[in-house]
């Protein structure tokens, strides 16, 4: 992970992505000097600098990096990708409407609203958003992180560079823009990032650069103005001592049943808070996160009104119990060696998957994207089962490749939407000029069970966990484990090993293996979660086991 370098006052940030705030995971700087002979440097996560000696070269390199000029559509058993109709769309927000047949997306480069008919496989003619400054800038875009539909079926989306939120009326095919009535003196925008609605249809949103909850009164909103917008300052006293420019608002989610708004706040990799706002009492309640959860971003509400949050500085996601304030941490599988082009069975030490945004489907299943894990995951709170879908695209321009001759990198699947009819998941590939679909109704090739589901150990004590894998179809199985013991899913000083790491199963067969876990002698007493399961290459299935250390 890298921090932005301040190159000069004439250097403009054209990409702020990955982590929320000034500390980011992917940064690109492009010099916009008038002198063509002046060098231009583009630095990005994770490694190399691209040097251009002319504006023409700068544009070419920018397009190669961010426009998916040479990308191809890929597929596996669960994922199908679709190339967008225009050049260099740089899609972020995507929205699966109603039953998931009509898929909306925003071109952050071209400033256009597009739609894809998943039944016919055809793209509709894109609709230009009236005001979009980056459309005329060859190396710029305006990030649109969120798009949702209101109760009337109209689309709302956030807009970074115009410092606004937009509404698209489908009946009249007209756009309206509502300007945020303030901006950041350091960044020139509040950077609207997340939007939601209450039961009355009023709109609520937050901006990365604004510690405030913004409210839009539908009856008072006026196109092209700030009328009807008001704000409620979010208390940030808990971030005292941290430079204000490093304090960011992550996202918000409404618990409509209880009239509560949940908001994530962070100083990336320094401090995290989850904030509860009661719409009736107009009171804030703040929950300080432990040090290992210092980058909370995405929030979704489960069927029991508990917020689930993704931490975009680790490989962890977690539940905050709304009644007790207790936190239960879970880990994704550890980062795949495939991301690094490694022939070994494990990724380099310290690799993170960076869970980003999280959403719930009509069955109460939680979905989230693993930014640098190159997966879309779903977690069933009822069965404590995590299923991860591998995205078949890898771009080595976005990877720390050990061997560039081997496929490596990630697809930059930065946002997604869950179709409420069929629960298929649609996601955008921001640097690849594509959208993709996960067929969530297709059966997994394996099922995993583990016993016991919860256990209590003393430090230094070992236990034998039985893990059973049953095959629905012929498959090769690789056993996996991870945990909430560390930020990246490793076991830390604890150890764990399977009696057999790899085997083949025929359809209908099952196999039980032992997993011997030994808690380290210096492990801090408390509750942890161990994830055990299997990988089949396109799909991973893990079961969560609670471990109480006494």
Protein language model features and the residues they cover:
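Conserved beta-strand positions in repeat-built beta-propeller and related beta-rich domains
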Residues: 103-110, 140, 157-161, 203-210, ...
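Beta-rich, blade/repeat-based domains predominating
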Residues: 87-99, 132-151, 183-199, 237-257, ...
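Long beta-sheet-rich domains in secretory-pathway and surface-associated proteins
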Residues: 442-550
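Blade-level signature of beta-propeller repeat domains, shared across WD40, Kelch, NHL, RCC1
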Residues: 404-445
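Beta-strand-rich domains and repeat architectures in extracellular enzymes and scaffolds
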Residues: 50-63, 80-111
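Short loop/turn segments that connect beta-strands within beta-propeller blades
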Residues: 117-121, 169-173, 217-224, 277-282, ...
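A short loop-to-beta-strand structural motif that recurs across blades of beta-propeller domains
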Residues: 112-115, 164-167, 211-217, 272-275, ...
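Beta-propeller fold detector
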Residues: 62-64, 80-83, 124-131, 176-182, ...
């Amino acid at each position: 992970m890298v921090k932005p370098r301040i190159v000069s006052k004439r250097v403009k940030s054209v990409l702020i992505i990955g982590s929320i705030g000034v500390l980011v995971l992917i940064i690109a700087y492009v010099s916009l000097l008038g002198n063509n002979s002046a060098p231009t440097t583009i630095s990005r996560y994770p490694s190399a600098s691209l040097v251009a000696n002319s504006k023409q070269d700068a544009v070419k390199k920018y397009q190669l990096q961010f426009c998916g000029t040479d990308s191809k559509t890929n597929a596996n058993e669960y994922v199908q990708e679709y190339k967008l109709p225009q050049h260099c769309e740089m899609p972020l927000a995507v929205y699966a409407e109603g039953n998931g047949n009509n898929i909306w997306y925003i071109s952050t480069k071209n400033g256009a609203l597009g739609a894809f008919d998943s039944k016919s496989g055809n793209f509709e003619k894109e609709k230009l958003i009236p005001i979009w400054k980056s459309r005329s800038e060859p190396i710029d875009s305006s990030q649109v992180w969120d798009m949702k539909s209101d109760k009337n079926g109209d689309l709302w989306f956030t807009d970074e560079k115009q410092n606004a939120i937009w509404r698209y009326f489908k009946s009249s095919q007209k756009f309206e823009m509502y300007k945020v009535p303030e901006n950041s003196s350091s960044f020139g925008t509040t950077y609207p990032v997340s939007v939601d609605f209450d039961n009355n249809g009023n709109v609520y949103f937050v901006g990365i650069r604004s510690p405030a909850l913004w409210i839009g009164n539908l009856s008072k909103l006026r196109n092209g103005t700030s009328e009807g917008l008001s704000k409620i300052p979010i208390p940030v006293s808990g971030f005292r001592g941290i430079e204000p420019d490093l304090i960011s608002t992550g996202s918000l989610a409404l618990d409509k049943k209880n009239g509560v708004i949940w908001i994530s706040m962070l100083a990336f990799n320094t401090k995290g808070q989850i904030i509860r706002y009661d719409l009736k009492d107009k009171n804030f309640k703040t929950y300080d996160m432990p040090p290992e959860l210092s980058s909370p971003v995405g929030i979704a509400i489960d069927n029991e009104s508990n917020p689930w949050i993704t931490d975009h500085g680790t490989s962890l996601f977690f539940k905050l119990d709304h009644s007790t304030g207790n936190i239960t941490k879970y880990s994704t599988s550890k980062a795949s060696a495939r991301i690094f082009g490694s022939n070994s069975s494990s990724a380099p030490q310290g690799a993170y998957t960076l869970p980003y945004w999280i959403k719930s489907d009509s069955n109460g299943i939680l979905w989230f994207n693993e930014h640098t894990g190159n997966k879309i995951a779903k977690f069933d709170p009822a069965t404590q089962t995590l299923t991860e879908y591998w995205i078949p695209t890898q771009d080595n321009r976005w990877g720390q490749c050990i061997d560039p001759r081997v496929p490596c990198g990630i697809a930059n699947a930065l946002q997604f939407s869950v179709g409420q009819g069929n629960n298929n998941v649609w996601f955008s590939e921001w640097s690849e000029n594509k959208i993709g679909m996960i067929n969530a109704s297709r059966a997994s090739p394996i099922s995993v069970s583990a016993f016991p589901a919860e256990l209590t150990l003393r430090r230094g004590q070992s236990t034998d966990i039985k893990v059973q894998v049953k095959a629905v179809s012929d498959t090769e199985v690789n056993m996996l484990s991870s945990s909430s013991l560390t930020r990246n899913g490793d076991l830390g000083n604890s150890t764990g090993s399977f009696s057999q790491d790899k085997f083949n199963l025929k359809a209908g067969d099952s196999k039980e293996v032992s997993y011997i876990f030994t808690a380290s002698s210096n492990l801090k007493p408390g509750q942890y979660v161990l994830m055990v399961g299997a990988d089949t290459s396109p799909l991973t299935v893990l079961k969560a086991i609670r471990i109480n250390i006494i």
